[in-house]
């Protein structure tokens, strides 16, 4: 990389200055003078090196970009000149005086001998500017160098097929639009230009090609005057007159042209219609009604479960002949709760022919049968929690649909104890919401056991629970029968299909309302108790929900004690 850099070895033998310093010992570089323009076209008199000159640098032998001065032809723009300084901001300073090391002064204490020594000069290769770019005839083809170092001129070919200068299209870097004058031409103008006004019509005021139109004029209506092209803005008193005239003109949708295929509407529908808006009698959004009848429109007597008995005469109260409470035919076909007997697996024959049964005489002309509370309780009583039987050990066969890994049937986790859910209404939801979300107050302990737990940060609470005196019943355990020749392994074999032991939840017929709330005719009094057939049965046989709550409270007290 640095092998071609020039090295000056004589600098090590001498000092900073030469031995002999004089007015001819150094060479001051002068700037080259450019050739002045002449009559030759296409910049033919610009400097150009000849092919015979051998230069040390290969880049200096061939003219590079921007070698020719074309600024005089490009920037000679006609127009005004702005007041600006065209001098360069940063000039290249060239000192005319000698530089350091040009003079060779003798050292102090030595004999000064003024002997001038000639310093060898290196021949400087410079470009020859005398040869023009368009050479003379017969010398434009160059020379040929022979083997004996003789130069021989090349002869021109018999025919010249080269393209002349008129066929070249020089491409400049700057477009013509950027070379135009962009200043203010106010100072360059010599006179004022007046705006010429033409008296003729302007563009778009007339149509050259006019089409003949057939004009139909009504005698009763005057022809509109089209010579007024200004905008008409009515005043207040004129706007009132125009609004009154508009009221006499029918609006959109006022006319309803009847078609041959339209259905004639009855006059009763127009009476009940709301008031018309915007003087229009047509409805904007008509309801889409289906032509098919709705479910329950027809009452077929042959397939109906119960047909209401028609009455004629003055026995009908309130001028009503329809039943007060109609029963759904789909609900009558399906069996209700308590319809099946689980113990016998036989459907109760409670469906009777309603036509053969004589209907009792009811009050207020109502034809809907009303049954007593006892009959309703017997008809709709479902199985309670005590009606189900616990599955015994003999019902299930051993090793039925079971697969165990390594023949192990030991249970991995102990069975979870079944907890009974409290009855609905046992908790006060509104009170708990107010205490937790609204007031943010905690209730004091209500029992003695809770007081012990709240004191001393639960230090008085027992660590182990007490022994439960009430043991499990005989049907609590469900033993798994094993084969006699089973191989016991140490690996646990879980069941493939395990049964889901859910928590105990009461059935739909576990709870029932009081007969005073359920029956509409029974009213509670303070002094007199109405005779009811269900009262003696209620004393002896308690409600299964009350039994469940009492047993749950008893187990809860035993659990805390």
Swiss-Prot record:
Keyword Repeat: yes
Residue stretches spanning the membrane: none
Residues in the signal sequence: none
Residues in STPGR repeats: 21-34, 63-72, 97-104, 164-191, 200-210, 250-285, 292-299, 334-367, 421-438, 471-481
Chain segments carrying region Disordered: 123-143
One Pfam family linked to the record: SHIPPO-rpt
Keywords tagged on the record: Repeat
InterPro entries given in the database record: CIMAP (IPR051291), SHIPPO-rpt (IPR010736)
PANTHER family in the cross-refs: SHIPPO-1-RELATED, SPERM-TAIL PG-RICH REPEAT-CONTAINING PROTEIN 2
Protein's recorded name: Sperm-tail PG-rich repeat-containing protein 2
Organism this protein belongs to: Mus musculus
Biological classification of the source: Eukaryota, Metazoa, Chordata, Craniata, Vertebrata
């Amino acid at each position: 990389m640095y092998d071609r850099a020039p090295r000056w070895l004589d600098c090590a033998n001498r000092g900073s200055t030469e031995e002999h310093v004089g007015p001819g010992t150094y060479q001051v570089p002068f700037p080259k003078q450019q050739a002045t323009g002449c009559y030759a076209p296409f910049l033919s008199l610009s400097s150009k090196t000849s092919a015979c000159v051998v230069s040390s640098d290969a880049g200096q032998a061939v003219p590079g970009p921007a070698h020719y001065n074309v600024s005089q032809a490009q920037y000679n723009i006609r127009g005004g000149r702005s007041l600006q300084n065209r001098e360069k901001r940063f000039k290249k300073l060239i000192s005319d005086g000698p530089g350091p090391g040009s003079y060779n002064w003798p050292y102090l204490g030595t004999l000064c001998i003024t002997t001038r020594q000639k310093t060898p000069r290196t021949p400087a290769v410079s470009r020859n500017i005398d040869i023009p770019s368009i050479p003379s005839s017969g010398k434009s083809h160059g020379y040929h160098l022979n083997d004996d170092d003789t130069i021989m001129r090349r002869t021109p070919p018999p025919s010249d097929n080269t393209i002349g200068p008129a066929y070249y299209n020089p491409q400049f870097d700057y477009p013509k639009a950027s070379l135009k004058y962009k200043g203010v031409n106010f100072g360059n103008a010599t006179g004022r230009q007046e705006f010429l006004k033409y008296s003729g019509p302007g563009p778009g005021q007339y149509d050259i090609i006019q089409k003949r139109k057939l004009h139909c004029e009504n005698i009763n209506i005057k022809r509109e005057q089209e010579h007024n092209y200004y905008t008409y803005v009515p005043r207040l008193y004129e706007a009132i007159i125009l609004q009154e005239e508009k009221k006499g003109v029918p609006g959109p949708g006022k006319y309803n042209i009847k078609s041959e295929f339209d259905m004639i509407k009855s006059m009763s529908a127009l009476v009940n219609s709301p008031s018309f808006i915007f003087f229009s009698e047509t409805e904007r959004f008509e309801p889409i009604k289906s032509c098919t009848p709705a479910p329950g429109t027809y009452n077929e007597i042959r397939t109906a479960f119960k047909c209401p008995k028609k009455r004629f005469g003055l026995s009908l109260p309130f001028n009503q002949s329809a039943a007060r409470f109609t029963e759904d035919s789909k609900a009558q076909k399906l069996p209700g709760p308590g319809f099946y007997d689980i113990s016998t697996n036989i459907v109760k024959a409670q469906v009777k022919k309603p036509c053969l049964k004589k209907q009792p005489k009811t009050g207020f002309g109502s034809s809907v049968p009303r049954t007593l509370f006892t009959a309703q309780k017997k008809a709709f009583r479902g199985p309670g929690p005590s009606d189900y039987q616990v599955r015994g050990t003999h019902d299930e066969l051993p090793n039925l649909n079971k697969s165990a890994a390594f023949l192990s049937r030991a249970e991995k986790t102990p069975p979870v104890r079944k907890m009974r859910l409290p009855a609905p209404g046992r908790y006060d939801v509104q009170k708990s919401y107010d205490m937790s979300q609204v007031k943010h107050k905690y209730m004091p302990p209500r029992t003695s056991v809770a007081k012990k737990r709240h004191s001393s940060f639960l230090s008085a609470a027992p660590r182990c629970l007490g022994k439960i005196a009430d043991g499990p019943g005989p049907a609590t355990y469900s033993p798994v029968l094993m084969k006699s020749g089973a191989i016991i392994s140490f690996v646990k074999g879980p069941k493939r299909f395990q049964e889901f032991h859910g928590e105990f939840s009461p059935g739909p017929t576990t709870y029932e309302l009081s007969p005073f709330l359920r029956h509409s005719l029974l009213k509670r009094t303070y002094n007199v108790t109405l005779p009811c057939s269900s009262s003696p049965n209620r004393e002896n046989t308690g409600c299964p929900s009350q039994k469940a709550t009492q047993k749950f409270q008893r187990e809860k007290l035993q659990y805390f004690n």
